[in-house]
C-alpha cells in the first residue's frame, strides 16, 4: 500500500488522483484507492481538511492530486440578500457545513434542513456537485494568550 503523510507544495504535476467526497476529505487517517487503482493509506496531521486541487506527496515520491467528488447537495437561493443571510444564520445555528457562492448557499442533502429552508421562503434545488464548504473561523488555527499574539486575559478585580 502506498503511504501519504505530507502535502506537496512544488510545481511538479500530479501523476495520480484521489477522489473523495467531503466526509472522507475530513479524515486524517484513511484507506482509499487512487484513480489508477493503487491502494493508498493517508496519515495526515489531525484536523486536516483536504480540498480539491491540493497535492499530496506519497512516500515513494509520487504526487497525488485531491479531487472533490460530486455528491448530493442542496442549493439554496433567496429573493434578496437578507433572506439568504437569514437562511445562512439558521444553518450556522445548527452547525451545518455550508459552501458560499454568489447569491447561493450549498449544503449536503438533508430533507429536514430542506423543509426548514423552504419554510423560511428559500428556493431549494437538489444538485450533484463537488462540495467545498467554508472551513470555519478557526480552521487555520487561532492564538492564545502568551503565544505572542498580543491577546490578554483580563482578571476580575483589575488583576
UniProtKB/Swiss-Prot annotation:
InterPro entries the record matches: UreE (IPR012406), UreE_C_dom (IPR007864), UreE_N (IPR004029), UreE_N_sf (IPR036118)
Protein role: Involved in urease metallocenter assembly. Binds nickel. Probably functions as a nickel donor during metallocenter assembly.
Keyword Chaperone: yes
HAMAP family with a match to the protein in the record: UreE
Family note: Belongs to the UreE family.
Major location category of this protein: cytoplasm
Protein name (database record): Urease accessory protein UreE
Keyword Chaperone in annotation: yes
Range of residues in the leader sequence: none
Gene: ureE
Entries under Gene3D superfamilies matching the protein: Urease metallochaperone UreE, N-terminal domain, UreE, C-terminal domain
Example GO molecular function: nickel cation binding
Localisation per UniProt entry: Cytoplasm
A biological process from GO: protein folding
Gene Ontology cellular-component terms listed: cytoplasm
Keyword list, A-Z: Chaperone, Cytoplasm, Nickel, Nickel insertion
Amino acid at each position: 500500500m502506498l503511504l501519504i503523510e505530507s502535502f506537496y507544495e512544488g510545481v511538479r504535476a500530479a501523476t495520480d488522483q484521489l477522489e473523495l467526497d467531503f466526509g472522507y476529505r475530513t479524515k486524517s487517517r484513511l484507506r482509499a484507492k487512487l484513480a489508477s487503482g493503487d491502494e493508498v493509506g493517508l496519515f495526515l496531521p489531525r484536523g486536516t481538511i483536504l480540498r480539491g486541487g491540493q497535492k499530496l506527496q506519497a512516500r515513494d515520491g509520487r504526487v497525488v492530486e485531491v479531487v472533490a467528488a460530486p455528491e448530493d447537495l442542496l442549493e439554496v437561493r433567496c429573493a434578496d440578500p437578507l433572506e439568504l443571510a437569514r437562511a445562512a444564520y439558521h444553518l450556522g445555528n445548527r452547525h451545518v457545513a455550508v459552501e458560499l457562492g454568489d447569491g447561493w448557499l450549498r449544503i449536503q442533502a438533508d430533507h429536514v434542513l430542506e423543509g426548514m429552508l423552504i419554510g423560511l421562503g428559500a428556493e431549494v434545488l437538489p444538485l450533484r456537485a463537488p462540495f467545498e464548504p467554508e472551513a470555519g473561523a478557526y480552521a487555520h488555527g487561532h492564538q492564545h494568550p502568551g503565544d505572542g499574539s498580543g491577546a490578554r486575559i483580563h482578571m476580575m478585580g483589575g488583576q
